[in-house]
Amino acid sequence: MPGKKSPYGLFAGGKLKRKRKRFKWNDVTYKRKMLGLVEKYDPLEGAPMARGIVLEKVGVEARKPNAAVRKCVRVQLVKNGKVVTAFVPLDGSLNYINEHDEVVIERIGGPEGRSLGDIPGVRFKVIKVNGVSLWAIWSGKKQKPTR
């Protein structure tokens, strides 16, 4: 008769804890968290938002089955010089953003910190332009300040 995989008995607790501690490292999410890989490769370096300068406007084609060009901007972050692509939400709001504008970006809110919906490779979205909320400019409540 073959033996059991796990120890059992009154004093098996220590052995069970040691086994659990060892086999936890086979879990990808645990390993990434413990080794700090998310912060290590994160352009925002763990911060919720970041300031950046708009380098260019780009159109990103939506994934199947949708056919659209999602309006995005390439942004160079002030804090570390990394260049990321950020989605511009709201209809026609790309018209309020020019090159060399200062924008604030945040995570787009996709699953596991990744891209959202049908926009491939875009993990961030624009929330402010030159210190004013993009939504306020778009809805006509405020005017975009000229730098």
Swiss-Prot record:
Family indicated by similarity: Belongs to the universal ribosomal protein uS12 family.
Keyword Lipid biosynthesis: no
GO cellular component: small ribosomal subunit
Name this polypeptide is given: Small ribosomal subunit protein uS12
Entry-linked Gene3D superfamilies: Nucleic acid-binding proteins (2.40.50.140)
GO molecular function: rRNA binding; structural constituent of ribosome
Record's subunit section: Part of the 30S ribosomal subunit.
rRNA-binding as UniProt keyword: yes
Keywords associated with the record: Ribonucleoprotein, Ribosomal protein, RNA-binding, rRNA-binding
